Amino acid sequence: MKAVGLVVEYNPFHNGHRYHAEQAKIKTDSSVAAAVMSGPFLQRGEPAAVSKWARTKMALENGVDIVIELPYIYAVQKAELFARGSVSLLHHLGCSSLFFGSENGRIEPFIEASEAFSRKEDDCSLILKEELKKGLSYPAAASKAFSHIFKGRDMLDLSKPNNILGFHYVRAIHTSGSAMKPYTTARIASQYHDAELPGDNSRIASATSIRKALIEKGTAAARSFLPEASARELEAYRNSYGIWHSTEDYFSYVKYSLSTLSAEELSRIYEVEEGLEHRILRTIRQARSYREMMERLKTKRYTWTRLQRMNTHILTRTKKEDMHRLLKPSSAPYIRLLGMTKKGQAYLSAKKKELTAPLVSKLSSFSHPALDLDILAGRVYSLPINEPERTLFEKQEFSQAPIRYDEDEKRFLNA
């Protein structure tokens, strides 16, 4: 029984994701698709529109067989660490391949780029430091460094988010010594950050444009770009909790957190670098919204994404020393199981003795500082939900067993 690994956020799960899962199984000749999915907060620092449990249900109804959670210590991170955590979890799970979307769908440039980087890693690191000193953002500086070492090759366009992530997935496979084989497929129709839904007959749209349509016009506006299960779960979540989460919902909590921190305390928060704490404390007194705060803080050096991640770490009070300690091991310390189909359950039963990290189904049965941070992130995520629903939401984190879905009878067995 072969499993293909997917690295996902499903914010929300849309038709493009369903196509991705289908192609992953076909192109890798795998019977099981295993997804490692970000929890409450995502790689760019924003909150997921709905909970990880709602997104797990969307995935299980649409071709994904196993969903595990990417711990917070990897989920809200730059591409390199996001990829390292994701790849290590899929390796722990025994996946034989990893499948990701890219701009042109050819794996060779990714493999060549990873090999070239290995040969010239010191040169690349030196150029990267020089470009950062000039005031460039990390992505821009990295792109310049990679351009230098990839001269004369079929160079990747590292200005594209999916290509950046793909490069780091392949790098993580190579550096970890995993036997997983990387595969890629070309993204179809919509670009990653397209803000508007396509006007043609396409049924594929970017998650960004779908979220925008949901917030502005409701589920009906995006329904043709979503599987039925996703539309249903989105509506059910809002009916239950009165919200689809967005960054603006957390502005008052960011403001409160900053009002209780001194500049010295703020400087110890992860991602607060180089005197940025003084700029943050000045800005928060003037800003009247999350967007205004971000516009005032953003510079060529400090990108929107980096600042957004920083704000999330401020909300969770994640200190540099704690994050560095938790990231010191080379691989993820546990596998948090969120859901599985019958086929996924059969795979896990067959592989149980071969898993290279503890499989966590109940929070009460396992303890780890990184898991404590996952729980804290879930509590922070629930802050904009009104009572008594917020308390019910928080209880679900401890009481919810992995979701089980019978793909033959098309029904959930415990959700």
Swiss-Prot record:
UniProt: ATP binding residues: 7-20, 101, 162, 187-188
Q: Name the EC number(s).
A: 6.3.4.-
**One Gene Ontology cellular component annotation?**
cytoplasm
**Gene3D superfamilies according to UniProt:** HUPs (3.40.50.620)
Record's catalysed reaction(s): cytidine(34) in elongator tRNA(Met) + acetate + ATP = N(4)-acetylcytidine(34) in elongator tRNA(Met) + AMP + diphosphate
Where is this gene product found? Cytoplasm
State where it is primarily located.
cytoplasm
Keyword field contains Nucleotide-binding = yes
**Presence of the UniProt keyword Ribosomal protein in the record:** no
InterPro entries tied to this protein: Rossmann-like_a/b/a_fold, tRNA(Met)_cyd_acetate_ligase
Q: Which HAMAP family match?
A: TmcAL
Q: What is this protein called?
A: tRNA(Met) cytidine acetate ligase
Q: Which gene encodes it?
A: tmcAL
